[in-house]
Amino acid sequence: MLESRRAREQSGRDSFSRYRAQVRSAAVATLSILEGLDVDRVYCDLHDDFVIRKNDGSGLTYIFYQVKTKGKQNHNWSINELFGLKSKLKDQSKQCSKSIKESFIGKLLLHTVVFDQFCNSVVFQSNIHNSDEVIDLMDDIESGSFSNKFTAVLIDRFNECFGEGAEKYTLEQIKERLSKLCFQSDVSYLKEGDSFFDLVVKEKIYQFSEIELERAEFREILLRLLDLVERKSSGVIKTWDAESIETFAGISIDDLLSILSISKDAYLALLNGGDPNAVRSASMIQRSLKAGGADISAVMYCSRCKIDWDLWFRNARHIVPELELLSISERIGSTLWKSVGPQGMLAVSTLRQPIRDLLIELESHGLKFDLTEDLILGGIFSALVKGKS
């Protein structure tokens, strides 16, 4: 009976679908934090759909994302839908400044003014493609030509639309701000259905942490990740300060370590010890030991041993002949692969005797130097991490 009459409206369903796409995109963005490079925060539903913070040698900058989807996959975004520009208007001086300012791209370009040098870029992300006119406009900006008729309108109206107070931007300043605009079109994980999104998330988790997840384990992590993004996207931030923004909108490495059940202490120890792949190392050490029944104290102990080994090895490269270092590393690798169990399981108790035997062997070949049982143990876990990278 219900199907016999079409519903008066389905705007709620459409709005929920768009919100779901926004959450998915932010969830994928948060996983880039695991890479351990310059992305250290993602802020959800703050100033725009989400914001990525980059922290490099020159300081903090922000990438503002706006996520828009369309149900019809064969639809292309028009220049009017995105920029508020009428494509068939012969006299470009009659373009409406208000339409430009209130358009999707107009709202993104405002960030380049409000946040000035702290705005790294602004991104329009979608599940569909752009029209040829939009592509031509972006090619014109990216090439540095700025000769397209629609680009000329944006330049001409920039101060009227986005100028703050009496401040007027020069031609070069306007070009610099327009050049911060980027498009990410036909994004697979924004399309209908879960298969693309699930695949991207699983690949990124493996890429940054070397965790091979069983189906049930992956679903649990995925649900926790989506729940985290939804929580950070909801509610009003009543006290507008840095601490409140971090608490109610920000996602950091701490949140992701919790979701992936990776020891924060082990991660920090490895990070502070100079390991550039601290997430991956902590994950692999923890999973191999926990498979053998170890607790978190064993994870911390083995992580510290790996740090000490890495430091010893870096220093030894300047003192010990390379052939001898290679011989030591080869013997440690052999000890590892003789000791590792099913699914990469390692138990500290089963490593004691092989480590002692290896030290005796190294001494007999004049390769012991100042190596200890703890350093050899660290070398074994260093070999484990390198072997799976």
Where are the model-predicted features located?
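Catalytic centers of nucleases
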Residues: G12-F16, Q22-G84, K101
